[in-house]
Amino acid sequence: MISGSATASHGRVLLPSQRERRPVSTGSNILRFRETVPRQFSLMMVTKATAKYMGTKMREEKLSEMIEEKVKEATEVCEAEEMSEECRVAWDEVEEVSQARADLRIKLKLLNQDPLESFCQENPETDECRIYED
């Protein structure tokens, strides 16, 4: 039985080929091939909710850590007086960081593209986004 091997951490699939094995990038989806009849393959799609890019994963982890820190700060500030202005500001900060993390998750699900592409759409004049034609 021939089957494609996949590495889930990078979202890549190696196609079952005798001559060459090329990785195929699939984003957050992992494709697997399974031999049903000799030389005929059926395609199965397995979804996985992991970030495709290391920087995106690190950003989400940092936002999660910030939320935990802000919650601790807010509970400390609100211990003395729950109705104070400082208490409201502290919980507003928690809400803002939580919203930033939620926005990142929504953006990842909707766009599911290279972060450089969205950056270049917003900043086409930067050096990272220049396109050279031969």
Swiss-Prot record:
Tell where it localizes: Plastid, Chloroplast
**Chief location of this protein?**
plastid
Transit peptide range?
A: 1-42
Tissue expression pattern: Mostly expressed, at low levels, in stems and, to a lesser extent, in leaves and roots.
Return one GO MF term: copper ion binding
A Pfam family matched by this chain, by name? Answer: CP12
- Name which cysteines form disulfide bonds: C78-C87, C120-C129
Going by the entry's taxonomy, the superkingdom of the source organism is recorded as Eukaryota
* BP-aspect Gene Ontology terms: cellular response to anoxia; cellular response to heat; negative regulation of reductive pentose-phosphate cycle; reductive pentose-phosphate cycle
Q: Which SMART domains does the record cross-reference, listed alphabetically? A: CP12
Q: Which UniProt keywords apply?
A: Calvin cycle, Chloroplast, Copper, Disulfide bond, Nickel, Plastid, Transit peptide
The UniProt induction remark is: Insensitive to light/darkness. Slightly repressed by heat. Induced by anaerobic treatment.
Q: What GO CC annotations are associated with the protein?
A: chloroplast; protein-containing complex
Residues of the region (Disordered) are: 1-21
Q: What does this protein do?
A: Acts as a linker essential in the assembly of a core complex of PRK/GAPDH. Coordinates the reversible inactivation of chloroplast enzymes GAPDH and PRK during darkness in photosynthetic tissues.
Protein family membership: Belongs to the CP12 family.
Additional detail: Binds copper and nickel ions. Copper ions catalyze the oxidation of reduced thiol groups and thus promote formation of the disulfide bonds required for linker activity.
Subunit annotation: Monomer. Component of a complex that contains two dimers of PRK, two tetramers of GAPDH and CP12. CP12 associates with GAPDH, causing its conformation to change. This GAPDH/CP12 complex binds PRK to form a half-complex (one unit). This unit probably dimerizes due partially to interactions between the enzymes of each unit.
- Record's protein name: Calvin cycle protein CP12-3, chloroplastic
